[in-house]
Amino acid sequence: MWKNDSLVGIQNLLLQDRLGKAVTMFENYLLTYPQRFDTGQLIDIKNNYQLLVDYWRKGFDDPRRNQLYKELSRRLFVLLNNVLLTDRMAHSSFFMQSYQHSSVFRRSFSISGLKASLESFVTNIAMLELEPEHLRQSRKSQLYAEHQQLQSNLFDYLITSEAMTDWQKDEFLDLLLSPTVDSFDQQLIVSALMLSAMMSFDMNKFHLLTSVYRLTTDEQLRQRALVGWVFAADAAKASLYPEMHEIVSQLCSDEQCLNELTELQIQIVYCMQADNDSQTIKSEIMPDLIKGNNIRITRQGIVEMEEDKLEDILHPDSTERNMERMEASMRKMADMQRRGSDIYFAGFSQMKRFPFFSTASNWFLPFYPQHPGIAHIWNQSKGQRFLHLITSLGAFCDSDKYSFVLAFEQVLSHLPAQMLQMVENGEATPMAIGGEVPNEEQSKPAFMRRMYLQNLYRFFRLYSYRSEFINPFESSLAIIFSNKLFNGTPLEAHFPEVVSFLMKRKMQREAISVLQNISEQQRGFQYYLVMGQLRLAQKVNDGLSATACFKEALALEPDNEQALRGYARSLYSEQRYDEALDAFERLLSLKPDNRSIELNVAVCLIDLKRYDEALKLLYKLNYEEADDERVNRVLAWCLTLLGKYEQALKIYESLLASDKPSADDLLNNAFCLWFKKDVAGAENLFRRLLSQQADSEFSLENELLVVEHALLLEHGLTDIDIHLMLDLLAA
């Protein structure tokens, strides 16, 4: 994606309140390109700034000085963003094409004129009922064709528009709340405003999106506005626009908004994991779906197979079992969909190469059958009922509905004739793999939002010019709960739910970013406990360490077993074995005779080279449960370090008896043999280990020369011995 480092640097100066330096650097930049930029506005800002400085130097006490300084900073920021937009178009074929495509529209554009055109379209469509029937269809097609061209021009105009003025914001709000303008047009405008504000922050566009979210009664529009203002909310700009905090705080005072933001965050994560879900469907669900049907997918399409009578004789219950597996797979897929998984992404991602999707606005249009790009297919007689039913009953986002209609002629030719005939005759109803979605479900805000997010996800993943945009699903924007604008708001009460969800999805780093956004006064025991667990698992070094987090938790609840266990483990991971031993022994005093804790005590004793004490405890644990592999593993290693090789080897023989022994057991057994001077035996085990770990990042050289180097030297081996072994294994 295009980036102008010089202009971004000037923007950062403004965000640091360095107005004077920003003016100077911006002036130098504009003078470098005098043929491309008009310096008139900058000169006016510079003169006003100089006037402010002159009054300040003379010692005048101006009560409006700070306000004027901020106003000039904002004016410069707006001018800077407009120059950034011009520069972007000069370096981007997509934005230049969008600008040129809407050039005629741009020259005559006015919001009042736009509103009149949109209202006229609604009126003209309503008046079609008065047209003679033989003229109605052609007139209808003409109206929709003209309107689609208007939509495309409007979209291109908005995504290449400069900063919005206050009066433009008010006029657009009036248009977006007007009941006389089609909701589909309003939804498209909101999407375009979102894209524009994401590319170049505009306070008025952000404010407009929040106002639409608060005031509209159209739920589809409301959900688009929600996604729009959340993705456009750039906390870094709050130093220039502190009213952003006030706007967001006001929104977060509403419980419905808090619930919707929480749902939105979870839905965004499900979109981000579409590839993983697609792989699950491909490997775990589709095989059973196909096996459970008497169909086969061939190059010629879906073929109905005759029943295998011999199979029925040999395995009379196989059909029933296959059917049960198929139904279970269907339920699993429907459950994934209900939870929020994007189950159709992989399939429909192959259907975005139609020319229809080369027009950017088409990715954001709500689905309507009269769209000139699909109307001729929608109205065809063959397979019409099948097409209409499948698009209305399945949980398809608008983008996928357009894809399905465009690909329908190909789909139709691959459907079994008998299946199609039954549907067309009303004898059967087609059902999407994810199951039918009742109208009641489709009318819920969460469903509407999920479908819109899937539209966006497809655009940012599949559109041919996607690299020209900031992808909110691949950047820090995706974890909206880490946005600093939500810090200190009532939304913090919902942070634990999102953190728990992220942890279950193995997204520890993202969970940490949410926890870090909790305000200091809200950081209690649970905060430090979870943060400690995350940092211990992720080994993240920024901010408080895992040990420090658990220590804070214990200061609040000294005898909490979870916190004490985490504290002990984190100390051990930092190789602070004596402190870890104290923590584990303290934990053992709270939970006497806990084998897991006793084993940890033994491990700490070994690392402190208190082998005899460790051995005594390990023998006790082994006596109580002789088949406990965890205990036997540590016992064998302790015996090895004590030089009791024969006893250790007997235990290793048992541990290595499994089909796939652990890498640690292979390595430690090899060390035991090597210390015993059985070089050939050690070599054999090292080779087994390397073979087993061939597809991993394991490095035996690193183990011998770095991780365990000191240990090897302590037990009589030399650097020459180590190099000879490595050379032998490499030969």
Spans of features found by a protein language model:
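Residue-level recognition of tetratricopeptide repeat
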Residues: 11, 231, 500, 533-535, ...
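Short coil turns that delineate tetratricopeptide repeat
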Residues: 34, 522-523, 558, 592, ...
